[in-house]
Design a protein with these regions (language model features):
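Aromatic-rich peripheral "rim/lid" segments of glycoside hydrolase catalytic domains that contact
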Residues: 3-125
Length: 125
């Protein structure tokens, strides 16, 4: 798996798409239950990290939207606020709001995708 996140790797998104199709073909629902963005040793406030989070969330959500007419798809966010990992984990866990409760670009990207029913994916070189 790429260190930057599943939503940034075409092969991972293709596999997600395949899993959703398989689930629907077998008369089951598909649920993403813990979407968040984990970081090791990177500044969670850096522009590059924020941009990767937006693209990753955009791609996961848009993949789900592309499958909505084939069966049930759902998305749950694991925590609303950016936070440190539990225990001795040296990581930051990013979500839709910063630690002060301010909405982040990832929230606006998800809202835009849902409103526009977007299915396009973004891949950077």
């Amino acid at each position: 798996r790429d260190k930057n996140g599943v939503g940034l790797v075409k092969e991972d998104l293709n596999y997600l798409s395949y899993l959703i199709d398989w689930t629907h073909a077998n008369s089951m629902e598909f649920h993403v239950t813990e979407l968040n963005y984990w970081l090791n040793n990177e500044n969670p406030k850096s522009i590059s990290v924020q941009k990767r989070q937006v693209i990753s969330y955009n791609n996961v959500v848009n993949t789900l939207i592309s499958k909505k007419n084939n069966g049930v798809v759902t998305l749950n966010i694991w925590g609303l606020f950016d936070r440190k990992g539990p225990g001795d984990f040296p990581k930051n866990i990013l979500s839709l709001y910063d630690q002060n409760g301010n909405p982040k670009q990832s929230l606006y990207a998800i809202k835009k995708s849902l409103i526009n029913e977007s299915t396009s994916l973004i891949f950077e070189k």
